[in-house]
Amino acid sequence: MSKETIAVKAQEVEEVAEQLKSSVSAIVVDYRGLTVEQVTDLRKQLREAGVKMRVIKNKIMVRAADKAGFEDLKPVFAGPTAVAFSEEDPVAPAKILANFAKTADALQLKGGVIEGKVADLETVQEYATMPSREELLATIANLLQAPVRNVAYAVKAVAEKGDEDAA
């Protein structure tokens, strides 16, 4: 191997290691058997959620996992492997990939890194069932609005009852 090739691969290992460290979620999948159309659809869904999916050679992923301090992640890098990286929402990649796997049997979740910790398949599947950040924020907003709304309805009902009594 030439020195240039080695330098390029070392640079790629650095980039992937940094991406692993900076992502709140990096989910590893086996995409063997997916059609081009399915992969395109999956990438589109991930992109809409702000998630980037990359196909990276296993040797590079193993070295990057080592460099990033995720040695326990190395066993999942066997066979055709893709990694979905999210820098904002730790739930989005797991949720999208798990939902996609329900319709595309060929896609298999393997594990990943979630919020700085190596996650096995079971943990990834648990995250896939959690509500997303946006869903949680909407729920909190509704909970905060409910008391105000209830008071407004009560005041309106009292006012209407007062109008009926006056008539």
From Swiss-Prot:
UniProt keyword annotation of rRNA-binding present: yes
Pfam families xref list: Ribosomal_L10
Keywords: Ribonucleoprotein, Ribosomal protein, RNA-binding, rRNA-binding
GO (cellular component) term, any one: large ribosomal subunit
Entries under PROSITE patterns matching the protein: RIBOSOMAL_L10
Descriptive protein name: Large ribosomal subunit protein uL10
Known role: Forms part of the ribosomal stalk, playing a central role in the interaction of the ribosome with GTP-bound translation factors.
Subunit structure: Part of the ribosomal stalk of the 50S ribosomal subunit. The N-terminus interacts with L11 and the large rRNA to form the base of the stalk. The C-terminus forms an elongated spine to which L12 dimers bind in a sequential fashion forming a multimeric L10(L12)X complex.
This protein's record includes keyword RNA-binding: yes
GO BP annotations, alphabetical order: translation
Gene that this polypeptide is encoded by: rplJ
Gene3D superfamilies: 3.30.70.1730, 6.10.250.290
Protein family (similarity comment): Belongs to the universal ribosomal protein uL10 family.
Superkingdom, taxonomy of origin: Bacteria
Annotated organism of origin: Lactiplantibacillus plantarum (strain ATCC BAA-793 / NCIMB 8826 / WCFS1) (Lactobacillus plantarum)
GO molecular function ontology, one term from the record: large ribosomal subunit rRNA binding
PANTHER family cross-referenced by the UniProt entry: 39S RIBOSOMAL PROTEIN L10, MITOCHONDRIAL
